[in-house]
């Protein structure tokens, strides 16, 4: 039993020494007014040999990247977009995948609540990604960033009201149930479809 505890302890020390080859940064470019749409720009940088998986449409095996936003001042989150991924056969998983080689950029829009007081806020950004190169894939990793947002008073500007929402079709192009969309749409829809 003592050997197992020592082994587990040493393994956890080694695991904590792992430094991801991905460096994340995020920012919000402009000030926003209550009720407006703003967006967080997230950048993942890494050496050219490394890649992360795209947001959607992954093959069997790899973990798609995921960007989530949170904060009590956020009314709704829109559909996260990304720069164009490369489609390629992944030797690590023996399947076709969509990846971002050497880096990626994501834009995560969100709508502020209308009754929000002007002031400084932090948008909590969660990024889940799996990073690989030609010979190794690390387990999926979740990182958090707090991104400052400056909310100023004023009426909602018309050009800052449109946003693609996260609504996905409950069925994919082949007629199969899109499980992620069913779960996102709520418990009742998920139970109904199951």
At which residue positions do the language-model features occur?
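Residue-level signature of transmembrane alpha-helical entry/exit and packing/kink sites
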Residues: 186-193
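Extracellular/lumen-exposed scaffold segments
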Residues: 17-186
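Sec-dependent N-terminal signal peptides
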Residues: 3-13
